[in-house]
UniProtKB/Swiss-Prot annotation:
This is Heat shock 70 kDa protein. Gene3D superfamilies: 1.20.1270.10, 3.30.30.30, 3.30.420.40, Actin, Chain A, domain 4, Substrate Binding Domain Of DNAk, Chain A, domain 1. The lineage of its organism: Eukaryota, Fungi, Dikarya, Ascomycota, Pezizomycotina. Residues 624-645 are annotated as: Disordered. The keyword Nucleotide-binding applies.
């Protein structure tokens, strides 16, 4: 196969590398720089990409495009797009709900999509690689932030196609950086590595375990709109405010012109402050031929960006929480991205991990391209290196995947941050009699109720046994390495089956929706817990009532129960079921009160039945007959025994059966007897012990006296 390259398509800078001769080479561009600005400029005569485009931005700001990565895969109405437009010197228009960049090129007004701008940067990276390798480059692995959604990933892949590249895979930037860190690490045992990737426009945190070439992502978090550009903008706003104080009569047009000329100077000042305590900014002829000159200290810069710096710790906390790993268990913190050179960022990370110093062994600007080059070699079939042959990448599902069960409850089968590929099965049953089929609805999200989550797809399984609780329906979720999910359902008795395939681009969430879901999950956590605690007693009462009703239909019960008792219990069950139908939104306390009322009628009748000495008929607790009193397998549950509850759960598709109060009360009644029996057995053993060890000794002593 032809050589494949790894490309880090960054917000502000891009980088390309290749793995060959058992080593990685980061390829310098025609200016001798190992990173290339992600800038594209349009003039009256030509199109410029990279360093040439950035160098003329002050003279041609309206036609020099940058930060396309902040627009790619987004809608024009996106609040972040709207906020960015205030800082962009070039014009963005709405075309079909998508942002389009408008420039003047060769005397004409042209429109370009973010994908097209990104493809131009990718073309530059491809040409850089071809000039170095002396041949054609067709295959590439392109990186994206871990928190990019499917729309953004697909748009990035489209940019690669426009650039004439066969994109072998889109991989996450922190995962690529982890490869760069771990490729030559041969430490024994499993190591927990946290990748802190703060670049020009995006921020990712990923926690991985690395062991013998296996790179397993445990959890990931981040912000696709936080990076060095935001720090630059704080400096720009600061200097513009200062400029306005000095020149109070400045017009909006002149202010806009000042804004266009200051970003490059502010970026330069920011870089200087990483190694110096103070720097100055000088812009020639900024206003009416007057030069603008001022200085800024590192302390002032840190104060301007303090809230942004501190916000980087929130994803770190979330990653550790999701992975259920204490910060003391993190072996290495790897800093990636140019913005991690800021001393305040390094100090915050170190302080968070109780003084542990971050690992700075890899170049933060090149680490992502380095790892992408390794992955490109693996995917292109390069088997010449032992180090690449031993690498295995395992990524994660960004959101929980599950089905809807009784009461509109979200029942996850695959939790968020589960390693993919993965396969998970659970067994469910039907919730009511004469149910000819079940509707299996697949959802994605973190909320307790399915109405608050995203529906991915649904299908029906028909031709199943009609008796409530009898069918055993095995639902299986199977997610492969490409994120394609197969959901199947099998009724074990009839062997009836059905399935659905859900792909990455079918009904998936946007980045905004993912962020909203996660934010809402935190915000409404208490509300979700309250709702779940309300539904539990509701379903417990419903299951209890229906199980009692089914038990009354059993012939043995019908024979042994007195007609008056049977009618009384039946009437109370009907009353409870009717109340449930009319009070679907009742409180937890009301459901518990109804359960107590039903128990007050049912328990004495149950006790009288047991006192008859007949034992439990089929379907009673511990028996295996059909129908059955609550708790028995005959009620549609697999025998799990005791108070642990059933193993096959009831659903509408399903809701878990709870241990039943009348069962518990019977057991509690016999507890003193069991305790007495245990004491009696202990006493007998004690007497035997004394007889065996002490009486023979006394007998022998009497013989010798």
């Amino acid at each position: 196969m032809a050589p494949a390259v790894g490309i880090d398509l960054g917000t502000t800078y891009s980088c390309v590398g290749i793995f060959r001769d058992d080593r990685i080479e980061i390829i310098a561009n025609d200016q001798g720089n190992r990173t290339t600005p992600s800038f594209v400029a349009f003039t009256d005569t030509e199109r410029l990409i990279g360093d040439a485009a950035k160098n003329q931005v002050a003279m041609n700001p309206a036609n020099t495009v940058f930060d396309a990565k902040r627009l790619i895969g987004r809608k024009f109405a996106d609040p972040e797009v709207q906020a960015d437009m205030k800082h962009f010197p070039f014009k963005i228009t709405d075309k079909g709900g998508k942002p389009v960049i408008q420039v003047e090129f060769k005397g004409e007004t042209k429109e370009f999509t973010p994908e097209e701008i990104s493809s131009m940067v990718l073309t530059k990276m491809r040409e850089t690689a071809e000039a170095y390798l002396g041949g054609t480059v067709n295959n590439a692995v392109v990186t994206v932030p871990a928190y990019f959604n499917d729309s953004q990933r697909q748009a990035t892949k489209d940019a690669g196609l426009i650039a004439g590249l066969n994109v072998l895979r889109i991989i996450n930037e922190p995962t690529a950086a982890a490869i760069a860190y771990g490729l030559d690490k041969k430490a024994d045992g499993e190591r927990n590595v946290l990748i802190f990737d703060l670049g020009g426009g995006t921020f990712d945190v990923s926690l991985l375990t690395i062991e013998e070439g296996i790179f397993e992502v445990k959890s990931t978090a981040g912000d696709t709109h936080l990076g060095g550009e935001d720090f630059d903008n704080r400096l720009v706003n600061h200097f513009v405010s200062e400029f306005k104080r000095k020149f109070k009569k400045i017009s909006p047009a002149e202010r806009a012109r000042a804004l266009r000329r200051s970003p490059t100077a502010c970026e330069r000042a920011k870089r200087t402050l990483s190694s110096a305590a103070q720097t100055s900014i000088e812009i020639d002829s900024l206003y009416e031929g007057i030069d603008f000159y001022t200085s800024i200290t590192r302390a002032r810069f840190e104060e301007l960006c303090q809230d942004l710096f501190r916000s980087t710790m929130e994803p770190v906390e979330r990653v550790l929480r999701d992975a259920k790993i204490d910060k003391s268990s993190v072996h290495e913190i790897v800093l990636v991205g140019g913005s991690t050179r800021i001393p305040r960022i390094q100090k915050l990370v170190s302080d968070f991990f109780n003084g542990k110093e971050p690992n700075k062994s890899i170049n933060p600007d090149e680490a992502v391209a380095y790892g992408a080059a390794v992955q490109a070699a693996i995917l292109s079939g390069d088997t010449s290196s032992k180090s690449t042959n031993e690498i295995l990448l395992l990524d994660v599902a960004p959101l929980s995947l599950g089905i809807e069960t009784a009461g509109g409850v979200m029942t996850p089968l695959i939790k968020r941050n589960t390693t993919i590929p993965t396969k998970k099965s659970e067994t469910f049953s039907t919730f009511s009699d004469n149910q000819p089929g079940v509707l299996i609805q697949v959802f994605e999200g973190e909320r307790a109720r399915t109405k608050d989550n995203n529906l991915l797809g649904k299908f029906e399984l028909t031709g199943i046994p009609r008796a409530r609780g009898v069918p055993q329906i095995e639902v299986t979720f199977d997610v492969d390495a490409n994120g394609i999910m197969n959901v199947s359902a099998l009724e074990k008795g009839t062997r009836k089956t059905n399935k659905i395939v859900i792909t990455n681009d079918k009904g998936r969430l946007s980045k905004e929706e993912i962020e909203r879901m996660l934010a809402e999950a935190e915000k409404y956590k208490a509300e979700d817990e309250a709702e779940a605690s309300r539904i539990r007693p509701k379903n417990g009462l419903e299951s209890y009532a229906y199980s009692l009703r089914n038990s009354l239909r059993h012939s043995k019960v019908d024979e042994k129960l007195e007609a008056g008792d049977k009618e009384k219990l039946k009437s109370e069950i009907d009353k409870t079921v009717q109340w449930l139908d009319e009070n679907q939104t009742a409180t937890k306390e009301e459901y518990e009160s109804q359960q107590k009322e039903l128990e007050a009628v049912a328990n004495p009748i149950m006790m009288k039945f047991y006192a008859g000495g007949e034992g439990a008929p089929g379907g009673f607790p511990g028996a295996g007959g059909p129908g059955g009193f609550p708790g028995g397998p005959g009620a549609g549950h697999a025998s799990g025994g005791g108070d642990d509850g059933p193993t096959v759960e009831e659903v509408d598709l399903k809701f878990p059966m709870l241990p039943l109060p009348w069962q518990l009360s019977v057991r509690k009644m016999h507890r003193p007897f069991f305790l007495f029996l245990l004491f009696l057995i202990f006493l007998i053993f004690l007497i035997l012990f004394l007889f065996y060890f002490f009486l023979p000794v006394r007998f022998n002593e009497s013989c010798f006296s």
